Amino acid sequence: MQQEVVLALLAKEPSHGYQLRARLRQALGPVGEAMNAGQVYVVLTRLEKAGLVTTERPERPNPAKTAKDPADRKTYVLTPQGQQRVAEWLTEVSWPKPDLAEFHLKLVAAAAAGLADPLGIVDTQRRELLRRLREAQRAAMAEPDGSDAALLLEGIVLRLQADLRWLEACERSWTTRRSTS
Amino acid sequence: MGRLLLVARLAARDLRRRPAEAALLLLAIAAATTTLTLGLVMHGVAGDPYQRTREATSGPDIVASVALNPFTGAAADPAPLEDLAGADGVTAGSGPFPVAGSEIEVGGQTADVQLIGRSVEPADVDQPAVTDGDWLRDGAVVVEAAFAGALGIEAGDTVTLDGETVEVAGVAVTAAMTPYPWSNCLVLCAPFRDDDGEGEGAAGGGPARPEPQVESLTDPGLVWVMEDELTAFASSPDALSYVTYLQLDDPDSAQAFADARQPQGPGDEDKPFLEPWQHIVEQVTHVERNAQRVLLTGGWLLGILAVASVAVLVGGRMADQTRRVGLLKAVGGTPALVAAVLLAEYVVVALVASAAGLVGGRLAAPAITDRAAGLLGGAAAPSLTAGAVLTVTAVALGVAVLATFVPAIRAARTSTVAALNESARPPRRVGWLVALSSRLPVVLLIALRVAGRRPRRALLGVASVTVTVSGLVAALAAHAELDAQLAANPDPRMERLGDVLVVITVTLVALAAVNTVVSTWATVLDVRHASAVTRALGATPAQLSAGLSLAQVVPAFAGAVLGSIGGPLLYDAVDQEDVVMPPGWWLVAVVAGVVVAVSVLTLVPARLAARRPVAPILQAETA
Amino acid sequence: MTTAEPRLALATRGLTKTYGDGESLVRAVDAVDLEVARGETVAVMGPSGCGKSTLLHLVGGLDRPSSGEIDLAGRRIDRLGERALARLRRTDVGFVFQAFHLMDELTVVENVELPALLAGHSPRRARARAMALLDRVGVEHKAGSLPTALSGGQRQRVAVARALSNEPVLVLADEPTGNLDSAATLDVLRLFEELHESGQTLVIVTHDERIAATADRLITMRDGAFVDETRLTGGTSGRLGALAGFES
């Protein structure tokens, strides 16, 4: 998990670790299900070491929120450097790079060496992507309308759809190559 | 100039793209204009040949006659006729001429004739104009032209008059008597006819008269003989009548002149009977005027049908047109240009149709107005006046403009984007009809909903059938009356009037049939998509085709009912004389016949539509 | 529904549909064997022109096969006449189309009750059933509106309600999301899922991978024939995070 995400979540107000986790869970929905309980604290510790975050002890501990972890009693606050880092992050335009070249080369190599049928590879890959799509789509259907997670899931679905369409193009292309060769 | 060319080219393209529609349109308007032309031509014909004959023969303003008294047997006395010649206002006169009844025999046919004794010298008033051969000479007679035509007599022929053989010197026309067989009777005729029996002195008889004691004639022809030979040819030489022809200083006052001196009743039989020339005109042109009324009315009815036809045709292709308008506008055509293109198409069709109608009507006119040789110039072709041409062209253009104006304006006003996107006119919703139809059997449900999608087309259907049935009922009623008249009184001209009625009726029905087919086809195309969906939802082809058919039959039924009410009213309006209303079962039969006819006409398009495969339509409209 | 319900809602054997002849013979559907169990949702995928729509029309009785057999709920339908096919469409099949094919001049509820009226049900019953169905698909508040006043997703819901009108054995959907945006597609998918859960048998022809992925079974079609069949069930759970790039 990226440090900047946790930093940005602290930008609104100083928060406890468990509060950050809850906010993450809400925004991610089923996508965040696999998130480890201690993960947020690991990131927070790293951020603290880097001087982007400081901790405060509560003057008046709230007895209603009895945490199991002693670390939970701490409130995390952004330092000025931390705030600057958030501001920089928000303006960044980085985007996850789909690694299509690898799969493409896999097909080319397999065909060239006669090791495997590119169409078979495409087909297997397609099933795998469909399975993923099914999972994402079912998760999306289970989300209530307008939830943050639904939007994320829609993104996943649309990307998988795009990938599947590319696989279709691969299949078409390799089918014609086979029939003309 | 370039714009004009563009408009012309676009209009021509579109017409050529749909030749069948253009042809139907042409046919519809041409039928109407032909009938209208006929009606207008007839207008000019009536009275015209008579006028010419009157001038050529120094026609009389008053025909005065005295006959033997049929009840007392007292011989006619020509003295009162001589007195009349000296009456105030009389400027010229001829006669009195003796008149006698006889029988002619020629080529195995016999007919009654009236013989009028004349001299070789031309008379000042009523000198019959010879159209074939020569005027009277000793031992030869002259035959009235219409009568000669009917019996096939020509100059130089030999005929037998009361057993005496005599040569025919010539054939002539006169304005002093209605041409055969409507001749006025100067001697006794039987049976006494109401309409033209005034020619004999015994016409206006009282209730308690003795039976006539003298032999009488039936529909006599007219033969002029030398005055001194008259008795030789007469059947009963003692029973002579006399006739005098008078001209007045004011021909318009002839009726008043006659009225003042007419015999008034029993006991007045010895007074001369006076017939003003207007009465003869009336007789001569009676048939033509009737034909003209029929033709004009028929022309208007056909015009209305043509409008309905054009409206359906135009409306049916609105969807297509709208897209075209969108395209035209998208490439920079102004609304005016678009409207001009649309109008140009129909105006071209209308002009061609009116030309066809004028030519057709002009060519057909003689066949209807031809009165053989009854009068001078009677056989000459009736002429087309500039006014008639203008009227016909204006009506044809009016039909086209009326039927295209609204769609053209609407199409031109549609937003370009909407026109490009819109694939069809959205159907209309008639809520109560939908609600009502859901309570009816499936076939009626389909029918009412199909009809309800295009209420204006349904109304046009109603109007079209109303007009047709009105015309049909009026024509049937007229025909029935005509038949009754003909049975009593055979007359080739009346028969021809019957032919005119038949032609108009057939045209009317044919145009209505075309309308029905066009309307059904437009509907079928229009509901193609809805039909496919309905079938996908489980309607059988039989239900659908019955529904599509019924969608036409229901308005047709309404139209037939309205028409069978309107028909007698129309007939009443056209025929000012006493109208014999057709019996009720006729109207019922007409309504039933219309329903059957429309069902049959719509059957084929509806069946074709209902059996078309559904899948491609549902596929094609996914977009 | 009869007491002895066959296990299969639909079965075809050697189903073939050809167009033209000689050189220009086109095999739109070529010897297709398909079995659909009751309650199953089957998606047929393939490029446009692969014959999937024709297949749907054949099994729905909108078109007749050139050869082969079709069993619908245990009844041979491939040799039925037009009339019998129409009755079959009325009682056993419900169609959902890409273009919705709602009648624009009828209100939503009038559209939904139409199949029941065509089947000869009383107007009262047809209306009541239509309202219940509209309630089920969640557009009962639009019952009196004209279809043109509805969004695409709503229109397709209405179309689904109409397809369900006569409690069909089989609902056949032809590209049901083809005209819909992403959100409306989700809407329709949810509706299909509800139908699936209520035991409705569904055959969906589509090239939308999302529908394909959520079906019980996915059949791929090429040139009129089935080339692949997959069941996508089986756990891949817990990988959503990875799919979103949210690695823990």
Pin down the residues of each PLM region.
Chain C
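ABC-family P-loop ATPase nucleotide-binding domain
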Residues: M1-T18, R231-S248
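ABC family nucleotide-binding domain
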Residues: R7-A215, M221-F226
